[in-house]
């Protein structure tokens, strides 16, 4: 079973407008409200793949109940911890081929709630083999909270796929608690290293050899339309993907995480892990909905992905 962790979930609200006018009334005819947050995008894709997945994290208030109901409607199992604060909204205004986002920070998590969630995980870890940890830390949680969570998972011999950025990721990399996989994009990798990084294979390879990545089994760097570059142990891979028509790229990284987790769960080899991860990211980008894939095109696309050891 794959357990997905979302500590700062949201209700994702999408408003579609032909024109977005400032300082006046904008009337919306097309509105969608869905359970959101990076980890829940991962969850939906895994569910659509047919993998055994359970969602966990922190939910509070009326809007937390809305997310539970939304997952129930999708027949996705969940075991969230209830908190005192209210779960947040994230609003996307789609207009004139552009997307304007308004993101709430979310509830403040108390120390008691933070400790309670780690105890909550101990109770549900047994059935899981793979843990995905995605997204930002809500207010109140220290920057080393993911490191503490990963340390707990390692104690239970669980594989962890981590998808976060900034100080939360930096804290993990500085700690002794290492995840199985991290999936930075090129911008996030640049922030970690503190200097610009090009698409050069030699530069990418030398970057991933730095001490900061020591102890991490897989480092998979997303390069957008250029595919990916990956390190697994002492092996390095260049992933080339075909050109596709992109409808909505939001959530493609989350779909990629779902592919990584699914491949680990099914014990795929390196080549097929990288192919599954990348094809799911591409399938998400071809859909209007975030965290959604159409498996009709799976075989056609995956056959065009090339993985080369370099």
Swiss-Prot record:
PROSITE patterns: PFKB_KINASES_1 (PS00583), PFKB_KINASES_2 (PS00584). Belongs to the carbohydrate kinase PfkB family. LacC subfamily. NCBIfam families: 1-PFK, lacC, PRK13508.1. The keyword Nucleotide-binding applies. One of its GO terms (molecular function) is tagatose-6-phosphate kinase activity. Its EC number is 2.7.1.144. This is Tagatose-6-phosphate kinase. GO terms for cellular component: cytosol. Keywords: ATP-binding, Kinase, Lactose metabolism, Nucleotide-binding, Transferase. Pathway: Carbohydrate metabolism; D-tagatose 6-phosphate degradation; D-glyceraldehyde 3-phosphate and glycerone phosphate from D-tagatose 6-phosphate: step 1/2. Pfam families: PfkB. One of its GO terms (biological process) is D-tagatose 6-phosphate catabolic process. It catalyses: D-tagatofuranose 6-phosphate + ATP = D-tagatofuranose 1,6-bisphosphate + ADP + H(+). It is an enzyme of class 2 (transferase).
């Amino acid at each position: 079973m794959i357990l997905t962790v979302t500590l700062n979930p949201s209700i994702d609200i999408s408003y579609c407008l032909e024109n977005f006018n400032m300082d006046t009334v904008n009337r919306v005819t097309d509105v969608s409200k869905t359970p959101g947050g990076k980890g829940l995008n991962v969850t939906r894709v895994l569910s659509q793949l047919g993998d055994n997945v359970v969602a966990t994290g922190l939910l509070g208030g009326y809007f937390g109940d809305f997310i539970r109901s939304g997952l129930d409607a999708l027949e996705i199992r969940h075991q969230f911890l209830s908190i005192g604060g209210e779960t947040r909204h994230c609003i996307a205004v789609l207009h004139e081929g552009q997307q304007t986002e308004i993101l709430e920070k979310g509830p403040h998590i108390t120390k008691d709630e933070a400790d309670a969630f780690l105890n909550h995980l101990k109770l549900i870890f047994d059935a899981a083999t793979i843990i995905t940890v995605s997204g930002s830390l809500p207010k109140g949680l220290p920057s080393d909270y993911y490191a503490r969570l990963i340390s707990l998972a390692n104690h239970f011999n669980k594989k962890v796929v981590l998808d976060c950025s900034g100080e939360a990721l930096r804290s993990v990399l500085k700690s002794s608690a290492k995840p199985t996989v991290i999936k930075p994009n090129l911008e996030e990798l640049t922030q970690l290293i503190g200097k610009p990084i090009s698409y050069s294979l030699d530069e990418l390879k030398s970057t991933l050899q730095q001490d900061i990545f020591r102890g991490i089994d897989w480092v998979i760097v997303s390069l957008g339309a250029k595919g990916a570059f990956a390190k697994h142990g002492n092996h390095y891979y260049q992933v080339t993907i075909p050109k596709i028509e992109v409808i909505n790229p939001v959530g493609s990284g989350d779909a990629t995480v779902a592919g990584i987790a699914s491949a680990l769960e099914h014990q795929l080899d390196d080549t097929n892990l990288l192919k599954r991860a990348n094809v799911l990211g591409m399938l998400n980008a071809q859909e209007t909905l975030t965290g959604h894939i159409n498996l009709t095109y799976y075989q056609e696309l995956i056959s065009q992905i090339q993985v080369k050891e370099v």
